[in-house]
Structure formats: structure tokens, C-alpha cells
Regions:
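Short, solvent-exposed segments of well-ordered alpha helices
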Residues: 1, 25-36, 107, 111-118, ...
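Charged alpha-helical initiation segments
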Residues: 1-32
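Amphipathic, well-ordered alpha-helical segments in soluble domains
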Residues: 6, 10-13, 37, 41, ...
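Secondary-structure edge/capping motif, primarily at the C-terminal ends of alpha-helices
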Residues: 14-24, 127, 131-134, 163-166
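Short, hydrophobic, well-ordered secondary-structure elements
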Residues: 28-53
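Hydrophobic/aromatic-lined pockets within catalytic cores
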Residues: 46, 50, 54, 132, ...
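Amphipathic, Lys/Arg-enriched alpha-helical patches that create a basic surface
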Residues: 111-126, 138-166
Length: 166
């Protein structure tokens, strides 16, 4: 899984800039950047979890290439239902995804994972496809993204561990 410290440090730096902006309008820049950076990091984590699992089990180089280019390589976004789950279904199959989700539910982390990733995706998607210029949009402070990170990181560690245990 991607290291937490670099994104944690970046979010901290963005919060410091947000708290002391050279121009008040820059607060929106730092907030939007924090959101996009956290979601980008989450996409990398999701990809890493899937790739690590699959590479440990797939032997045929053609299937590894298919995995990297067509399954993981064409998955964009950090939403569980729209991005991560379909990728897992292609890699481990629907019945195994069901077992995996049941295990995460038993551990009490599945609904939190789905809810937080969905929440972030609903913030990220419009932010990623619009410009701040001339638009009155407000974004949550970088500290909010740090809270998401601190909540999701241990859950993603469990996700990785439970997936690799299958």
C-alpha cells in the first residue's frame, strides 16, 4: 500500500497554507488541492491493493498485462461501488467479493469504507471537472481531508490484509 506519511505531510502543509493565506481566495485553492490529492492517493492505494493481490496469484504474463492495462489501468476514481468493487469482481469474482464484503462487515469497517469513499468521490468528481475561476464553490478545509485520511488508512490496511488472506 502507498505510504501514508507523504500524503499526511502534504495535507498538513496545505492546512498551514490555508490557515495563513497570502490572499483569502487562495484558501479555496488549498482546499481543492487537498481534496484532489487525497483522492488521487486513495486511487493509488486501491490500485496497489488490487495489484498486490493479483500479482501474487496470476502466473500467465498475458493475464498480468490484462490486469495492469485493462482492469486496474482503466479504473479511475476512488468510489467503492463505482470503482473498487467492479475491479475486485473482475479479479476475484462476485462470490469472493461477497465473502470479502461480509468479512469486512463482520469487522465493522465495510459501511464506513463505502460511506467515506462515496462521500469523497461526490466531492472530488465536480472539483476535478471544474475550474475555481469565476465559480463560487466552497471546499472543505484541508484538515477535513486529514480526518478522512486518518479514518480510512487503518480501514484500508484491514482491506489489504483481508483480501490477501483470501
Amino acid at each position: 500500500m502507498q505510504a501514508k506519511k507523504p500524503i499526511e505531510d502534504l495535507l498538513k502543509e496545505l492546512q498551514e497554507l490555508y490557515d495563513n493565506p497570502a490572499d483569502p481566495v487562495h484558501k479555496d485553492y488549498y482546499s481543492k488541492l487537498a481534496l484532489l490529492e487525497l483522492c488521487g492517493w486513495l486511487e493509488l492505494v486501491i490500485d496497489d491493493i488490487a495489484l498486490k493481490y493479483a500479482r501474487a496469484r496470476i502466473i500467465d504474463p498475458k493475464n498480468v498485462e490484462l490486469l495492469e492495462k485493462e482492469i486496474v489501468g482503466k479504473t479511475y476514481g476512488c468510489d467503492y461501488k463505482a470503482n473498487f468493487r467492479p475491479m475486485l469482481i473482475k479479479i476475484i469474482g462476485l462470490t469472493n467479493v461477497e465473502q470479502f464484503e461480509n468479512k469486512l462487515t463482520t469487522l465493522g469497517v465495510f459501511q464506513i469504507l463505502v460511506s467515506q469513499l462515496s462521500s469523497l468521490a461526490s466531492l472530488r468528481n465536480p472539483a476535478a471537472h471544474t475550474s475555481i475561476a469565476g465559480v463560487m464553490t466552497t471546499f472543505q478545509a484541508p484538515s477535513t481531508m486529514t480526518n478522512y485520511l486518518n479514518s480510512l488508512h487503518p480501514i484500508l490496511t484491514i482491506v489489504e490484509s483481508e483480501l490477501n488472506a483470501m
